[in-house]
Structure formats: structure tokens, C-alpha cells
Design a protein with these regions (language model features):
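Non-catalytic alpha-helical scaffolds and adjoining flexible linkers that form interface surfaces
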Residues: 2-204
Length: 204
């Protein structure tokens, strides 16, 4: 992860007798051996060895989890061309590990991913103050202004309650391992948290 995005050439990796066969999987963390190729290959690296450390095979048994796994990899790959940080790898590994456990609600995984991706993009959701700079108060419901990217206080109350904001704060401040300990039964809270996290991620 400390090297960022690399262009790698894997020769004959799908041949049955290849020493690389079975050592590369999309939904896996692998230990790779790489050598710098000649200038004739435009500075690409050549894969010389590969060993699977963790294989997230269970997520492939569920279509929705599989599709989101593809989407997460695509988004991290796209962002890695602009943002150079090992945390991208950490976020992706956390998402894949969570998707691999069918006991974890998929909406929680999506919410966690969107929140952390938004932070890496520089569009982190403001969960401390409202549009007027006032501290968010427990027991008060707020609306959300997409243009200002901030919660808005209304005299009659808003759509997003304290439980939604608490969940977003918890997910924002913790690694993906926290998801295995959460059981959110309030469907509205889950739906609203995912919506707000998605807004933050899309604005980045």
C-alpha cells in the first residue's frame, strides 16, 4: 500500500502450470513480488511471485455484496490516481472484510465506506455544527442543506434525528471492525445515514 497505484504485468498467470496460478484473486489481500521492467515496457513492473494472505470468498456468494465489492474496488482505484495514501488500502480491506460477513448489514458497510471515502476526498460530513456554526444539540432533529453541505436547524424540527447523527459519528470515527458489533433495528436511521453519507461522498 505504501507504493500507491502501480502498473503491473503478470505473464501467463492463468496457465495451470504457472507458478503464479492460484496466487492472484480480485477479492483478496496478496503478498506480491515485483521487479522493475525495462524502459521498453514504459516502466511497468513485472509480477514474479504472489501469495494470497486473506481471501474474501464469502462475499462472492451474495450478489449485492459482490456488486458493491466491485464498486468499492473501482472507486478506490479511481481515487488512488489522485490521492497517495496507504489509508486507501486500509479502507478497501475494511470494506471487503465487512462484506465477507453476511451478519453485517450491507447498508452499514456502504455508509461506513462513503463516510471514509468522503474524508479522503476532502468532503467529510460535518457532524459537529449546523449551517450557522452552532453545535449540533442532542434531542434536536435537523434538515440537511445539500448546497451548504451542512445540517440546518428548523423551529419545527427536521428529518434527521439524534440517533442518525450518533450513528454517523460512530462510523466516521472508527475502523470497519466496529460494524460487526452494531445491530441497528431502526430502518429510518439506517436509510437516512446511508443517504447522508452518500451525499458527502458524491460531493467530493
Amino acid at each position: 500500500p505504501e507504493h500507491g497505484q502501480l502498473a503491473v504485468m503478470a505473464k501467463a498467470v492463468r496457465r495451470a502450470k504457472s507458478k503464479l496460478a492460484g496466487g492472484i484473486e480480485l477479492f483478496a489481500i496478496c503478498e506480491l513480488g515485483l521487479v522493475k521492467s525495462s524502459s521498453a515496457t514504459n516502466g511497468m513492473w513485472t509480477l514474479t511471485s504472489s501469495r494470497i494472505i486473506v481471501f474474501y470468498d464469502q462475499l462472492m456468494l451474495d450478489y449485492d455484496r459482490l456488486q458493491f465489492g466491485y464498486e468499492a474496488i473501482k472507486q478506490i482505484s479511481r481515487l488512488s490516481s489522485a490521492v497517495d495514501t496507504p489509508e486507501l488500502c486500509q479502507v478497501l480491506a475494511g470494506v471487503l472484510a465487512s462484506l465477507n460477513s453476511r451478519l453485517i448489514d450491507l447498508r452499514l458497510v456502504k455508509t461506513w465506506f462513503s463516510l471514509h471515502l468522503a474524508r479522503l476526498k476532502g468532503s467529510e460530513l460535518n457532524l459537529l455544527t449546523d449551517s450557522n456554526g452552532m453545535k449540533l444539540v442532542e434531542g434536536v432533529s435537523y434538515d440537511y442543506d445539500i448546497a451548504e453541505q451542512a445540517f440546518v436547524y428548523l423551529d419545527g424540527g427536521g428529518r434527521y434525528d439524534t440517533e442518525t447523527i450518533k450513528l454517523l459519528r460512530l462510523l466516521s470515527a472508527n475502523p470497519a471492525s466496529i460494524l460487526a458489533r452494531l445491530k441497528i433495528e431502526n430502518e429510518t436511521v439506517l436509510t437516512n445515514a446511508l443517504y447522508l453519507a452518500s451525499l458527502a461522498e458524491q460531493s467530493g
